[in-house]
């Protein structure tokens, strides 16, 4: 008998909503959080739009001792984790400390904290670099801070597979739950909207340079020209439903199937492996392609990448056979936070029986053969969902959720 791993709590911090229900209401209404960068003056950079999380003040939500030591990305992870636990009705003190685990994903670490410290180093010298730089930048900082804050002393991990990380973190948490953990606090956030971070992102050539926020990120569109970066993400509580604790509320859904693959180097001239990742995830879930009710796409917004994803989906489902959506068009690409947020969105979609829209995309490439949910939500009974993610460098991941 397969284990039942249920998602019992969700916490979201996103550009179009700083709580789960704010985000969900904005997403169903098609309200975008993408706009001009305000965190610094972007005038000298070719990309000047981002999905910033506005109205989020860490010092109002976390102790000053923590905010002083940690980066903005960790602040969002801590708050999302707090909200996921509260949503699940979990009091960590009531559970054995070695049976709780934390897994987070990050693709950039604490770049904003590092920006401040490098500015001090460049302008004033090494005596003006704080000691906390040594821990605030590190990819595992969020995992460490969340586990300390909640007294979770079981096996923990940090995943760095770019946007695929949000799904890979769930896969790693599943392994830990299968190995005896009772509860996992899992997800991903990222925040790299500072000069240092933006320069690093520009290096991959994928960022849109359009100034029109409504047209800058339009995946699967005839005028697709890249993606807009963003910040934020989501955290979840995942529990073994037979683990001895009665869930404090409804179960959003179950982790039914997961798989990850890695693309061969371009010079090998072998095809990418996203199709295989999806196939393996479906097999892991014990589901046929025609049993998937909706796909949450990676939707990179680069024409060649969009076509590769469409070809993978069509190879499995056939053209126009399953609704496909990309709500991240309202937040920007959140890197490790993006796939985690897609998982949250998929779970909320199954809860409410509605598929949120892809916004901005108005002239879809017909030859891609996708049944895109455009413009407005689509009501539909949803029992299953597939979330797809790709990370720069060849990472692919697929996650199947069931109700």
Enumerate the language-model features and the residues they cover.
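Condensing-enzyme catalytic core mediating Claisen C-C bond formation in acyl metabolism
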Residues: 4-8, 31-36, 212-285, 293-294
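Conserved beta-ketoacyl condensing-enzyme motif
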Residues: 7, 22-24, 28-161, 189-198, ...
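A glycine- and small-aliphatic-rich helix-loop capping segment at beta-alpha/alpha-beta transitions
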Residues: 21-26, 111-126, 176-178, 198-211, ...
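Acyl-CoA/ACP chain-elongation machinery
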Residues: 181-225, 258-271, 297-307, 321-371
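ACP-dependent fatty acid/polyketide chain-elongation machinery
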Residues: 1-66, 88, 242-255, 344-359, ...
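Active-site-proximal alpha-helical scaffold in enzymes
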Residues: 77-90, 139-142, 147-150, 156-189, ...
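Flexible, low-complexity linker/loop segments at domain and module junctions
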Residues: 1-7, 92-97, 287-291, 368-403
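Glycine-/small-residue-rich "gating" segment that lines the acyl/pantetheine channel
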Residues: 123-130, 171-175, 191-246, 322, ...
